[in-house]
Every structure is written in structure tokens, then in C-alpha cells.
Swiss-Prot record:
Main location: secreted
Keywords linked to the UniProt accession: Cleavage on pair of basic residues, Disulfide bond, Extracellular matrix, Glycoprotein, Hydrolase, Metal-binding, Metalloprotease, Protease, Repeat, Secreted, Signal, Zinc, Zymogen
A GO cellular component annotation in the UniProt record: extracellular region
Gene name for this UniProt entry: Adamts16
Lineage: Eukaryota, Metazoa, Chordata, Craniata, Vertebrata
Protein name per the record: A disintegrin and metalloproteinase with thrombospondin motifs 16
Amino acid sequence: MESRGCAALWVLLLAQVSEQQTPACALGLAAAASGSPEDPQPPPFSGSSWLETGEYDLVSAYEVDHRGDYVSHDIMHYQRRRRRRAVTQPGGDALHLRLKGPRHDLHLDLKAASNLMAPGFMVQTLGKGGTKSVQMFPPEENCFYQGSLRSQGNSSVALSTCQGLLGMIRTKDTDYFLKPLPPHLTSKLNRSAQGDSPSHVLYKRSTERQAPRENEVLMITRKRDLARPHLHHDNFHLGPSQKQHFCGRRKKYMPQPPNDDLYILPDEYKPSSRHKRSLLKSHRNEELNVETLVVVDRKMMQSHGHENITTYVLTILNMVSALFKDGTIGGNINIVIVGLILLEDEQPGLAISHHADHTLTSFCQWQSGLMGKDGTRHDHAILLTGLDICSWKNEPCDTLGFAPISGMCSKYRSCTVNEDSGLGLAFTIAHESGHNFGMVHDGEGNMCKKSEGNIMSPTLAGRNGVFSWSSCSRQYLHKFLSTAQAICLADQPKPVKEYKYPEKLPGQLYDANTQCKWQFGEKAKLCMLDFRKDICKALWCHRIGRKCETKFMPAAEGTLCGQDMWCRGGQCVKYGDEGPKPTHGHWSDWSPWSPCSRTCGGGISHRDRLCTNPRPSHGGKFCQGSTRTLKLCNSQRCPLDSVDFRAAQCAEYNSKRFRGWLYKWKPYTQLEDQDLCKLYCIAEGFDFFFSLSNKVKDGTPCSEDSRNVCIDGMCERVGCDNVLGSDATEDSCGVCKGNNSDCVTHRGLYSKHHSTNQYYHMVTIPSGARSIHIYETNISTSYISVRNSLKRYYLNGHWSVDWPGRYKFSGATFNYKRSYKEPENLTSPGPTNETLIVELLFQGRNPGVAWEFSLPRSGAKKTPAAQPSYSWAIVRSECSVSCGGGKMNSKAGCYRDLKVPVNASFCNPKTRPVTGLVPCKVSPCPSSWSVGNWSVCSRTCGGGTQSRPVRCTRRAHYRDESIPASLCPQPEPPIHQACNSQSCPPAWSTGPWAECSRTCGKGWRKRTVACKSTNPSARAQLLHDTACTSEPKPRTHEICLLKRCHKHKKLQWLVSAWSQCSVTCQGGTQQRVLRCAEKYISGKYRELASKKCLHLPKPDLELERACGLIPCPKHPPFDASGSPRGSWFASPWSQCTASCGGGVQRRTVQCLLRGQPASDCFLHEKPETSSACNTHFCPIAEKRGTFCKDLFHWCYLVPQHGMCGHRFYSKQCCNTCSKSNL
């Protein structure tokens, strides 16, 4: 039990942190027993200190021997070195540690990570002017260890002992981080602790963002707020503050190499010179070595300090190395650091910013120019930055890393950028390096789930706190290692041994109730409400007043799960049983040999076996050795008229459209070594070539003059004994595995000087010569020339200089090299079939030309020279098509011994064969889908559809024929597809017209017009009218003309307006009258005599009403002071503004006293200043047989000047005036 004093001090120091609650989204870890996601539980750690959560444990660390007996508390590396010098200890580099705390008692069996750093590893510091310092890192300073926990299967440990214990402990249940406590905190805890004083803090990886760091604890002791560390993707939280992994860049880019003056030649390391690596075998499960260069930027240097940064970075990489040795990866990957570069200042050509994409591009280009002084290069480069990076902008955001996919071993793409986030940085590096190995995120284009808690999950959130490699990651890695690109990883590291001893299990020390308290607080207990729950798979706990909940973490090994039962390996078994032990994988039987890939010329056959007998499980090891074996088959020569195997593969694409066009393809062979096994073809008649396939068919020769063959995209060695992988070679005499005893090598030097621009004989090489080598001893301006005895020049003849390259003549292949910085060189393995004369085209000074060749010994057994035979042979061109019927041109050629073409005069002209066009490739082509052009999209925006004709066809007998769709490859190409998915601009939406305001004659009708979004894939939304200003707004009103109204329906009673009140106060009256009127179609009324409307019922309306009901004020003619008061005076009414139809008349009203303006009149007594007048209807003259029209073009001005009431204007402008009265 922990002492109360220690716990109290810890709670006091971390009081402020304990007030912070776990984000609500962390509840995704604790599921209620009911399983309802809508019923979230409160955070399990609310209101309690860190120590009470069970996520943290203060442990005491000390060294023990292999038996577990105490050795010393001095565990730091320099202390152990001093102690080992004083006392010889058994075990060599083995280290045994004990971590003991209130909740954990762990025994660590470790071994020095001797292969973490390459021989000659150095740390280089770069400043503005270049290298500032180079620090050697001798092997005895290696303070990094890897190993496992004793008696805990499937566990791993990666720690450094440089300055206390720092690193990672992985169990099958969860991942832990271990850190030393700061010295000032250690001393305080030591004064309050009883027994072993705690020196380290052990906490789960899922809580790292809350873990105490040295500067944070110092800030807390000063009663300041805890500085919030960077969030990263190893948090379980899914809230807005979570760091997401915007990484794994699929963009296949190739940055331009930097200029020569920007290349940096660092001397931070001097690794041992590599031997020439053998080619990596396909499908081999061998130990692979990733030689890694680590670069640390200035921001991260400032954060950790120059004195601590090396230890910190190597500790992180030691953890990364352990992650890549995890058994779930399905391979043996060793991370070996070949150099560490510390950037104290900005470097030319390297731009590091918040923008992760730009930083990655710059770093990949910059590191491509780095190499050791001995010319060695790293396989992989890692940039560690202290900046808060973002994948898409130059501002801080939630990105943790960035990397190209499948960039490993590439000079320009084997690089990653990683943001420093504490010890969790190791998982970021492993994740991004996984992308470089060709891995993509789980759940993105594969069958693995995002939430399974694997290292390649889009967001690093462990399952039960444990992180592993998914089956998809294993497949991606296996696929990458089977390519030629992985050749840089062929180095083999030394294996690391592990110790395993029996010991008491954690579940025996801490029962299920105690484990619940650690996870959910002091009041939590094992949930006993549902006995069907298996605590060996998920520990279910409950607190008072709450439902059962779990973090989906199994109970610890050895926990009691029933009567005489305990948990072992996730299963509840009888007490004493070990449960499922680690099962190591074993190979299945070999499969039968596959059919040969070629019928002649040397094909490939293979057989496979799987690691399934049984599969590795419960921490078992993966099978060692090869999953596939290969052998050559059908090695006999192909007939002389057969088509070249590589040319046949190119011809297969003649019937396939390339960017919309058909071409005739021929092999393009001027390739770099890494591209020999890619199918590069050049379009006949054009000057471009293209890689039509990333690998040729198995058995294709790597090059024309090589026995090596391509297998699964890699060039594999074939010996002269025709055995795959054999190192057998021919000696100078052409004898396979010979010792040069059957021939004599002739050597000489030609150093004469002559006049320039002439050919001079140097040496004559007889027929049958082998191992020919002619070379300049120094660079000169002269040229080596070769001809036969008949003065036919094959190289540099007739004062014409040929390009360097491969040349075939005299029955042999010659390799001609000429460079401006190297001497001229001509080589050939031979043998030649005619005498060759080597000459020198003399140009200036002759530094000397050396030559050598081999001839059979005179005493060797010779066979009499056979007389040459001359015969005709038909040489056919390639078929115009690869199938379905084509034509090829045939011509006759004269050959010596059916090998060497000679002049036609050597052959009998009477036996010359008939030549011309002949049919070829008449066999039907494979069925394929014939697709037409897409139709016009049904919509211009907002998501439409388009279709195209698709039919299954096969070319046979020179024409295309339709066949059933079932005979074509499935699935069928899509017939329909979406198109124009971009959002549509807003537009005016019109509603239906309402009914006309009239039932007959002329009226008005209305409709609604609104601006709406027109995207059919989303719900229409009303927008402001300003959003539709790009097009005019439709009308909302329009005139409607109906049938002519009947005469009798025009008559109606109209009521006039109320007249003015007869008095201003004290009881007056107002009147209005009913008049008979006739309404025209135009809407204008005409007053008629009342008798014409007698047949119509009068409306029941009040025609008189009282008004002026306000009492008249009673006031003296004088004011309160006895002075006289002013009175209101009104002028006569003005003339009415209209003679009919309603007008207005006005008058002036003033307050006067004795003829002078005054201001003391009562406002309520003020008379009206305006009044309605002439409210009767205007008469309309109607003449039979005429119609209303305008007689002048200026009639539109009449109503604007109010002249329609004038008799002349109303008559001459009848139409305009009638409309103005509407």
C-alpha cells in the first residue's frame, strides 16, 4: 500500500490538474451495460487526483540479477559502467530491472540494443556556415535496451538508461510509458514515503497528454496553470481538440534534385562500407535493415536543449525499433540509425514551416543530396520538428505527420515529417514510416476496420490501449518487400535473445475489484449483476448509482474469474492451467510447381508454402525462411523465326488505346538498372516511350546480352550453369566455372605517335577471340576504330564517330563507352566469328591504348573447322496485330550457318523462297468490352447522369463481332455515371398564377417569385433576392383579360366618402350618399340617374353619423394674467384640384391677436386647413359607333400635367386619360 503522506503530497502537487475533467468524447471508451450510446456516463476520473485514477503509478526502479535478487538502485548507464568495471558481472549486455509500485510489480529482462546504431555512428550539429561539431558515439556509451517482461507472453520493452529509465513497456493488455520523476519532486516524495522511495512514474499511453513533465510540475509548484502539452493522435478522444493523422500522401511526386551548390556533404557518420548487396529474393521473409538518417530542427532543439536532445531522440527511435519488431508485422524489420543531424540554424535549400506538405517536399529534396564522405547513402530519412504542423496551410492545426506512400528506398521519396509530441512521437514515426513501406490507413480501401486500434488506423486510438499492425498492414508490407524497390533493405541485423522466467502474475497480486478502482475510481467494484460477462475479455465495473461500464480492457493475467478459475490469454481456464501458450508458426507443405511462364528461352516455375501449419498466435513467432522457391524451366533456345519475348509483350498493347489512340509498340531497352524489369515500350514512328507495365512477365531476360531474368519485377541472377541464383560464371576462355587454363590471354600497348586525322593499325584479333578489352590509358582526343579484313567498318569508320552503346557485329556483342571525363573503352565477352582489325583514328597526343583478348591454347583439343554453309532463311516482320487476324511482311535473307547474315550472292538464287505479305495471328482475340462515347449530361449542374453504349466484342477473322456479355471480363464497365456534380447557381423560382381579380373583363393576377438554391442533391433553400441578381426577376403581377362583362352586371350602388363634420365640437353630423354608377371594362365608373339602379337592392349602410363629440372648451377671453388671448382666423377655401372624381381644396389658418401673429391659441380649436371636394363621379361621353383612342403622339404628357379634366385634352387623348384614372 502507498503511504498516505506520499499520496497527499502527490495530490497537493497535482491539485490543479485533478480539477480538469476528461473530455466528454472520452466516454466512447466506457460503454454502459445497456449498450445505449445515447446514455453517456460522466467521465470516470472527474474530481479525483491522477493517482486515484489508476492510470498512473509511482514506482521504484532498481537493478536485479537474473534470479531476481537485488543488485543496486544505481540504474543509470554511467553508474552501471563504473560498477561493472569494479566487479565482473555475468550476463554481458543483459540487464534485469524491477519496477515496484502500489499497482505494478514488473520484472524486465533486457538486452542492449546493439543494432540500433550503425558502426561509426556520429552526431553532427549544423550551423549557418556548415558543420559546427561532430560527436562520436562509442559503443560503450550505448544506453538503449530492448526486451520483454518476465512471464508475460507477447510483451516488449524499449528503454534508455542514459538519465534514468525512459521509454515504453508493451503488454498484451495495454501500452505504458515510463519516465523519471524530476529531482525536486523525487526529493519531496522521498521525505514522505515509507519503504522504497519512488523514482519513476508509470502511466498508460492513452493518458500521455496528462502525464507530468518536468517543466509542468515546476509550474504547478509555483501555483500556476499547467501548460497544456500538444495533443496527438494517440489520445482516445474524438473531440475537436484531437490531433488527427493527415498523412500518407498518395501523390507520386519526384522533386527536382537541388543544384550542385546546394548539396551538403555531411560527415555526421562514417558507416562501414557496404558490400555490393545481393538482389533481394522475391517473397522472402528475411531480416531487413532500414538504415535511417534522423534530422532534428531548431525548434525541437530549443525545446529539449542541446545536452538532452541526443538521448531523447535515440530513446524515441529505440521505441520505434521495438514497434517494427512486433510479431504482428509479419516480417523482420530492424531500424538502424546511421546518422543524427541537429540543425541549430536554417539550412540552404531546406524550408521548415507549419505547412507539412511544403516542408515534406523541401525536406525530401534536401535529404536527397546528403551522403557520407565515402559515398554511402541512407535508406530512409526522418525529420523531427518542434513546430505544430498542418497538412494544408501554413498555420498550426491537427496534423501529426506526413509521408509519401511507397517511398521507401527511393532517393527522393523515402522521407517523412513528424511533429514532436513526447514519447508518443514513436508511434507517429512508426505510422508515417509504415506509409513509406506502402501501407495505407486501415479501413480506407481495404477490409480492416478503422477502430481496431492498430498502428495504421487513421487516428491512433488503441484497442484496450494496445497498438499492433493489422493484417492489411502485413499484406501491404509483404507486397512492398516483393518489389525491386525494396532492394536497399537487404542487410541482415543480428538477432536479439530474450529471457523468460516464471513469476507471480499481476492478477494474483491485484484482484478484479482493485483493477476496477484503478480504472473508475475508489468506489468502483467488479460488476456482479450479469454473470454472462467474461472479465477475461473485458473487465466490467460499476459505481454506486450507475450502470455497469467497461473500457473494453481485459482483466489482468491471473485474475480470478470463477470458482477455481483464472484468466490466461483472454480465456477463463482452470486454476493452474497456463491457458493458450504462444504458438509459433510452421510452414505448410510445398505446393506443386506452377506451369512454366515460357515455352522456350528460359521461363520460370514456382511453388509456394504458407505459414499456416499452424499460424502464429498468442505472441508466437512468424515462420523463418522463404515462402516461395523458383526454378528455371524450358531453357532450350527458341526457333530463329520466333518473336522476341519482350517484343511480344509490347505488341499486346497494339490493340489497346493509349490516351485515346492506337500505336504499334516495340521494346525500349536503353534503361537504367532499376528499370530493366519494367515493360518500357516505344511507339513506332514516334519519339516517345512509356512504361506500359510496372513489371515484365516472369522469365523475360533483363537485357539482351545477359542471362539474368526478371521475376516478379526484379532482375534475378542466373549463372552460366543455367541455375537460378547461381554465382557460376565463365572464365576468359568461355568455360563455365573454368580456371582460364584452356586459353591464352594476349596483351599489348600501342603508344606510337602519328599525324592527326588518319587511321593507324594497332592490333589484329583473330576469329574465336574472347574476353576482348581495348581501352585508353588516359583521356585523349583520338578514337578507337574496328573493321574486318574486308575493310568494312563496324565502329567509328570513315571519319565518322559513333555514339557510345551496345553494338553487335562479328557474332559478338561489344560495349562501347566514351565519356568526357573517362578514357575510351571497348569490351566484348566474344567469341568472334571473323578476324577483326583494331585501328586508332589519331587526333593529337596518344597517351597509349592497351588491349587484351584470349584465344584457345594451341595444345587444346581442336575440332576441324567445318566449312560454312549458306542457305536462305525467311525473315518475317512483326505481325500488325497481336490477335484477330493481321498481316506481316516476309523477306528472304542469306545466312552463314543459319546465324550470320551475309550477302545474297553466297546463296543459290534458284532456291530463293517466295516472299510478301502473309496472314498472321488469326486466332480470336480475348473478349473485351467495347465502350462508346458518353452522352451529353442530363443536367448542366447539380448532378446529372449520362450513358454510353457498352457491348462485349471479340476480334476474329479481321473483324469485330459481338458475343454474349458473360464471356467478357467481369464486372461490366458502367453504362451510366454521374456527371456535372458541381453545385448549381441560385435561380428564380416562380409559383403558380393566382386567380384573376375579375370574373369578366380586365383584371389582375399575382404569383410568388423567390430566389432559391437549385442543387437537386440538397434540400432547396430560400435565399435573399441579391443572390439571384445574375438574371432579371420575373414579373409578380400581370393583366388578365376575361370575357366581356354583361351590361346588366355593370350597374351597382357606390357610396361616397363621409363629408366634413358640420361643427368642430359639441355635436355635429357627417353625411354620405349612395349613387348609381356604371363600371366599364377599363375600370372607370360613370354616374347615372338613381332610377336606373332601382332594381338593385341598396346596401344597408349608415348614411349619417354624429361627429365633433368633444366638448367645446370653456375659457375666458383672457389668460390667467388677465391679458387678452389670440384667436384663429381662416382664409377662404381655394379652388378644388379636380372638377370630379375627388379633389382637394386648402386654406390658410393663423393665430392672430389684434391683427398680429400670436402663439397662445388653443390647438384643439384650430380649423381644418384642407378638405375633400368634388367627390362625385366624372361623366364619360359615349358615342355610338366610335372607340376611345389617342389622336396625338404627345398624349402621354397630358396626365403628367393633370390636364385630363380639360374638355379638349380628355377628348383628343381619350385612351391615355382613361388609363390614368385606373
